[in-house]
Amino acid sequence: LGALVPRRIENLLAANKNIGTTHITNGCYRLHPVEWNIGEAAGSLAAFALDTGRKPKDVVEERGLLRQFQRGLLADGVPLSWLLDVPVGDPRFDATQSLVMAGGYGEGTGALEFGPDLAIGPDERSRWTAVQWVVT
């Protein structure tokens, strides 16, 4: 989301090929499905900023506002993370997406599967219960 919000210019959102990226990651961002997702994210962020009277930069920088924005996306069925085994419509979709976004799963692993039917161990259980997801 931070790639859409310029550091020095207020109330401007980048979308599509003009987002803040490097030459290394640009190979991913130039693909049409990713461009469409970037456009959807920019439009959703603009609408959220207008609805809340806040600047897009505030949403990126304030954790509570970011979580509020993310909850709205989840309510609309927009995935925040690519989990191949917990698709939109799965009753566990919101919970698993929220856990990933709050840093309770997959951080730094690049995992595309959540494994919702697998048992978890005590270490993983304690890490999950420690996750802070802003509710208000």
Question: What do the predicted segments below correspond to?
Answer:
Residues 20-32, 49-53, 106:
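Glycine- and acidic
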Residues 50-89:
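Non-catalytic terminal regions with compositionally biased, polar/charged low complexity
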Residues 36-55:
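Internal hydrophobic alpha-helix adjacent to the cofactor/substrate pocket in enzyme cavities
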Residues 8, 31-38:
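Secondary-structure capping and boundary motifs in well-ordered enzyme cores
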Residues 90-103, 109-136:
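Short, solvent-exposed alpha-helical surface patches in non-cytosolic proteins
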Residues 25-30, 44, 55-62:
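Composition- and surface-driven signal marking solvent-exposed, interaction-prone regions
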Residues 1-27:
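FAD-binding beta-loop-beta segment adjacent to the flavin cofactor pocket
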Residues 47, 51, 74, 78, ...:
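Sec-exported extracytoplasmic/periplasmic mature domains
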